[in-house]
Amino acid sequence: MYFYFFNKYNLKILEKKLLIIFKYNISFKILHELLYLGYEYSFLYNYSLNIKDFSNFIYLLILYKNKINNIYNNKYYEIKNNYINVFLNNYYYLKVINKIQGILNNNLYNKINPIYSNLFLFFNNKIKIKYSQLQQLIGYKGYISNIKGMIYEKPVINNYINELNIYEYILSCYGSKKGIIDTALKTADSGYLTKRLINITSNFIIKELNCKSPFILKYILNMDIYGNIILPLNILRFKILQNNILNLNNGTFIYTKNTYITKYILNKLLNLYNRRNIYLNIKSVYLCNIYNNICNTCLNYKQLYKYNLGQHIGVISSEAISEPSTQMVLRTFHASSILKDKFNFNKYLIYKIYLYKLNINKIFKLIINFKKYINIKFNLIFLMNKILYNYNNILFEYKYILQNQYIKCNFIYNSISKNFKYNLNNIIIKYLNNVIKYYNYSNIQLLIKNIHNKWILYNIYTYYLYYYHIKFYNLYNKGIILNNNNNKYNVIYFLINYFNLFSNYYYKIYNNNYNFINSNYYFKMNFILKNFNNIQILNKLFYVNNIFIYYKYEKKLFIYLNIINNIIIKKYLNFYKYTYNKLFFIKKYNNFLYLYEIFKYNWYKYLLLNNKYNLYIIYNNYIKYLYKYNININLYFIKNLFYNNNNFIHNHIIYKNNYYIYNNNMNLYQYNKNILINNNLLYNKLFYNYINNNIYNLYLNDITIGLQSINIIFENKNIKDNIFFISNNIYVIFYIKYYNYLNNIIYIYNICNKYNINHYKYKLNFYSYIFEDISSILYSGYSLHTEFYSINKNLKYYFRFLLKSINIYQATKSSYIYVYNILIESILKQYSYQNIYLPSIYFELIIKKMLSCIKIISNNFKIFKYNDIISLQLINIINYSLNLNKHYIYKYEPIILGITKSILANSGFLTNISFQNTFKIISLNILNNKIDWLIDIKSKIILTDLLPVGNGWYRYLVN
């Protein structure tokens, strides 16, 4: 079944098509029929629901997260049965609505409740309501919270008609006071936001036709996190194309230069066969050469006239941005009865862990809920460095080691990479001759770069576009394959082939000669070879990476055979051996020889070409964060990337930073990060039943939308979070504070006692799909204030990376461009989730101001002091002059300024002392001379000067 999503632009296209194809009378009848359908729908039900109404409800996003982008990117959208049952033609949903409507139509509601309520008022008068309003109306009423958000135990039962008692009257005052104060404060915040936006953009007046800037931004089609091939619609819409697009099939031009980019054009480009070779060149406001202003060409936006000369585009954009924010204040529903979390009186099994460590004053105490994990097919548990499984009530343990190194020649810092979905059908476990073998079929994964230069990990077999780049190797070779043959694509392939994860082989040979051919990889091999004198190896049948090991009781030799140079290297036991980027070591236990192969992926140069950044966390198939620690020597630790699934996390992360070894324990404690890492911890586990019968741990929640996250992005606010580690051997705790709807969450991934057959797993109450949007610092209207994605750290690290190869100005400008698109998309999404669509040019003007200054980090100069905030173009001119005269130049670093700080940095002295922090500004400038050029709008108002407002420039309009 196909559905067409209409907006104003689509309706205009429909009218034109109808008039071209049909006559006026037929077109009139079709449009009139559509009008009747709309009226019939509006009178049939009181609900005005759209699929976009669910974008702000985090727990419904999982139902259509893989399909929602197709609504905006494709002309038609096929809704499958599982999605159509949820949103559009849900039989049970319509059945409930029909029952409610039938009760109202038959006047049964008056018999049930003769006192009119708000719900009856909405239904009886056919007032359109949204889902959030309906949620407020049908929720349990009467529970009141105090100023701290705690709910009182007794609700308000009566109303003003039936009279309130003194207890209920006092409680009702809380809600009245809260509604009045919230409305007043948020309206004031919205008005103050308008004032700040106009102050920051007041100087943007189009005075130049063309600045002759040679720089453009190139956009290509890429894969988003949902697997869709997309173009950045929000950024490209309302822009002007700067290049010709050629159809490679027939050699004709699809679109030519100076074409106005619309959604229809982007959809047509997405449907082309050779779309992967298409580049869209767009002029950018940030790349304009004019100091503290923009030209008409770089504005790249057509309004009413051919030229925008004289247009006060800064004030227009600020008003266009801030006016919807005022409307968002009116969308705050003071829902006294909407509970933030569900509560019940069921019994929960609580798992307490008390950790104690000698010589460390820090004691971790954590309480989590957990559920028992049961695998029906095979009782398998994936741990950090071993696999535990239960077979015939016997616990087996198998070890494997994978070394963590650096991804070669790539930058994926702070990206969130998505792995393929875990499928148990790909796992085969065979029991043959009391030998347990664990198999996994061939999997090919890749890292691709998306629009914002971020790496995304995907399974090749599910997305057809990248079949062109698959480079199949021998089935027995595995590792990272980097394809640099085509510079247009930055693609890394993880080729993981058919292999045996663990296996026990017991060879008993009694003849003198033995021919041994092995072409598989094993994480663990046990070889017992007895009574032999000669060993014959068939070199022709061996592959490059094959190994041959034998064990001799008398001399205890470990022999590694390399077929490349046909040299047999002999080493004693328990020695590490490097040969062609492969590391092996063996271990003797109970007359068995255990061979461990440490797979090296050559992940050096992976982050900023610096070995200081060595640690990253993979949890729920996402590369989340990288920590910066100095590593002086190599420390081999256990790592498994093969079997990351949604149920378990099994990456053993150990890094070295002034560690010491005592009683075979490696201990690490960082006081500033509150990180405690131990190999063998002394911990006590207590189990008890906890009855959740306390209503005081619940909080009431308002339905607030929009304005808070907009303020946070514009002001560049940061919320610092504590991040810990907990696992079986290394404890990882994530303590994450979210801005709006989630306060304190503790994630504990794996809880397992290897001496106990019962293994437990904590089921997350906040799933990982919240973090899927890797190109934005907010998701579904909520800001992500975690250290997983800190835009300021991202800017700083990228600047340091670029500084190694280019000069300081180029590194600063490039790093600003790097975060430019992220900030634009973040703020555009905040408005689009509220069904407010504005041209991106309005936001680009503000973000250009936010990214226009730097911070001085030099100490030996007199003009500018340390931590002074100066314009980037100004300091570049000064450094150029200093360099010509062979003087030391200023050292600086990029900084993202909020709109308030940007106003203070770009305004004169009079504006600053009348804006904010008057006493601080006067005290800082009391000993220094300060020159005010009186060029900002507030200085002109103070001095009653003429304001640069009006469309002027009449000669350009006439010509």
Curated annotation (Swiss-Prot):
InterPro entries: DNA-dir_RpoC_beta_prime (IPR045867), RNA_pol_Rpb1_5 (IPR007081), Rpb1_funnel_sf (IPR038120). The keyword Methyltransferase does not apply. GO terms for biological process: DNA-templated transcription. GO terms for molecular function: DNA binding; DNA-directed RNA polymerase activity; metal ion binding. Keywords: Apicoplast, DNA-directed RNA polymerase, Metal-binding, Nucleotidyltransferase, Plastid, Transcription, Transferase, Zinc. Its cofactor is Zn(2+). Its main location: plastid. Its EC number is 2.7.7.6. It is found in: Plastid, Apicoplast. It catalyses: RNA(n) + a ribonucleoside 5'-triphosphate = RNA(n+1) + diphosphate. Zn(2+) binds at C211, C288, C295, C298. It is an enzyme of class 2 (transferase). Disulfide bonds: none annotated. It holds the Pfam family RNA_pol_Rpb1_5. Binds 1 Zn(2+) ion per subunit. One of its GO terms (cellular component) is DNA-directed RNA polymerase complex. DNA-dependent RNA polymerase catalyzes the transcription of DNA into RNA using the four ribonucleoside triphosphates as substrates. In plastids the minimal PEP RNA polymerase catalytic core is composed of four subunits: alpha, beta, beta', and beta''. When a (nuclear-encoded) sigma factor is associated with the core the holoenzyme is formed, which can initiate transcription. Belongs to the RNA polymerase beta' chain family. RpoC2 subfamily. This is DNA-directed RNA polymerase subunit beta''. It comes from Plasmodium falciparum (isolate 3D7). The lineage of its organism: Eukaryota, Sar, Alveolata, Apicomplexa, Aconoidasida.
